[in-house]
Structure formats: C-alpha cells, structure tokens
C-alpha cells in the first residue's frame, strides 16, 4: 500500500473451458487488451524476461505468454513464478492457437487459397477457446467482416447456456446466461413484450464506480415499470446489476462489439 490511488475493480467471465473464460476476462478489462499479445515483451533478452517473470504485477500473465513463445519450459516458469502448472498448460494452449493462426496468415500471404490455409476446423477451435474475430483477423490478415462471414456460413455462432446457480444439487432455472461455441442455445428469445437492452459499465475503475451501476439498475427498473422486458449485459461480479433478479435476463459477457452483437442477434431488442 502507498499514497498512489489504485483501482480495485474486477471482472468475471464464464465459459465451458478455462481458456475461453480467460480470453473473455482479458477483453472484459476494457484496457485496450484483447489477447495474450496485448503487451509486447519481445524486445527483451532472455535475462530481462526472467527478471520480469519474478515481478508480481498486473502484466505477469503477458510475460508468461512471452516466455512460452520463446520455448521456456512450463516447469521452469512454475519454479520462477510459483504459478500452478495447470494454469501454465492452459496458457500454452492459447499460445499454440496463436501460432496456428499466425501460420495460416503466413500461408495466405504466400499465395495459398484461404480455404486451404485457414480451414473451418481451425476457425471453429479458435472460437471454442474464445479468440475474438478482431484477433483472428489480425493474425491471419483476413478482414474481420470476412471472418464473420466464414463463421456464419459454417454455423459457428455463439450459443448461450444458463448458469446453474445450485451446482447441480437440484434443478434451478435462472435467467442468467453465458456464451460458448459448439453448444446448444438455451437462451430462448421471447417476443410477447417490447424489449430494452441495458449495457452495464463493466469493471469498477478510478473515476467509474458504483454510481454508474446505479444508473444501469434504475434505468432497468424504469423500463420494467413501463412494461418492457429488460435485459442487462455486464461482467462485474461486485455490482447490483449482475444480481440475477434485477432484470428479466442477465448476460454475463464482455462489453465488446462482437459479444454484444451476438446477444442482439438473438434477443432483437426494440
């Protein structure tokens, strides 16, 4: 602790696999980061990188990712950082996908047809572990609109699962959803009332705190009074807006254009 003001906000993400949940959490931070390449440590030599590995700060996950790119053994990273090997193995899976997408981009630039260099199976797996279209586009050099078209033509769309709030101890149905790819959609869109979709304010930061969540909650209540079906998208576990009984439906998702658009496509709010 010191005299410098620091934010204490947090994000929460849910997915059917850890890799996907981590990718969602990274882009939920809303700090111009969207993947494990968002901080560049490639300019460091190996000794400098190892010194960075020993430092505990908010960039450590990106430092570990750079070490994995350089072929540093997971066991050595564990010994230096004391991060459990299970988590390092999961980061390695994300780095392997990053390398596969970069290789597809190299093949495309060398003249190989896109459908051969970037098969649908690779796109499907990238989306399963929640690589956003923006990152896939950046790594493969395929325009983002074309990535989206390829996804839709292959039926690769986000599906929404209901959160089991009782850990399967007994049946529980709550209107509380998270996205994943490759599963059956459980968020049935209703059309008996007009709908309004409220975007939450995401993680608490310096200058953005509970007063913004107050606005989200009270606007939701106001629309409810007017007879609207209310839907909230947010990713902050500390807030009132992510209580599952505030709105008719809650989507626990990042607030990026792609994530929001996927929900809009299903719900079609007025």
Kindly label every feature range from the protein language model.
Residues 1-270:
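ATP-dependent carboxylate/acyl-activation modules
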């Amino acid at each position: 602790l010191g005299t410098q003001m620091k934010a204490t906000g947090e994000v929460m993400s849910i997915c059917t696999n850890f890799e996907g949940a981590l990718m969602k959490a990274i882009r939920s931070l809303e700090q111009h980061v969207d993947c494990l390449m968002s901080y560049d440590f490639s300019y460091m030599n190996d000794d400098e990188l190892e010194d960075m590995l020993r430092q505990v700060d908010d960039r450590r996950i990106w430092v570990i990712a750079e070490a994995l790119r350089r072929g540093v053994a997971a066991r050595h990273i564990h010994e230096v950082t004391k991060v459990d090997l299970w988590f390092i193995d999961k980061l390695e899976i994300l780095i392997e996908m990053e390398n596969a997408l970069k290789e597809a981009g190299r093949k495309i630039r060398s003249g190989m047809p896109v459908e051969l260099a970037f098969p649908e199976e690779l796109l499907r797996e990238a989306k399963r572990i929640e690589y956003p279209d923006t990152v896939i586009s950046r790594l493969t050099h395929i325009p983002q609109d074309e990535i989206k078209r390829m996804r839709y033509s292959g039926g690769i769309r986000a599906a929404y699962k209901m959160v089991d709030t009782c850990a399967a101890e007994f049946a529980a149905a709550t209107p509380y959803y998270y996205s994943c790819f490759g599963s059956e959609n459980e968020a049935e869109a209703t059309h008996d009332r007009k709908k309004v979709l409220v975007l939450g304010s995401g993680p608490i930061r310096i200058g953005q705190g509970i007063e913004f969540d107050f606005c989200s909650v009270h606007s939701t209540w106001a629309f409810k009074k007017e007879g609207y079906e209310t839907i909230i998208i947010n990713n902050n576990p500390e807030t009132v807006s992510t209580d599952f009984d505030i709105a008719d439906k809650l989507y626990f998702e990042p607030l990026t254009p792609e994530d929001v658009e996927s929900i809009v496509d299903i719900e079609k709010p007025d």
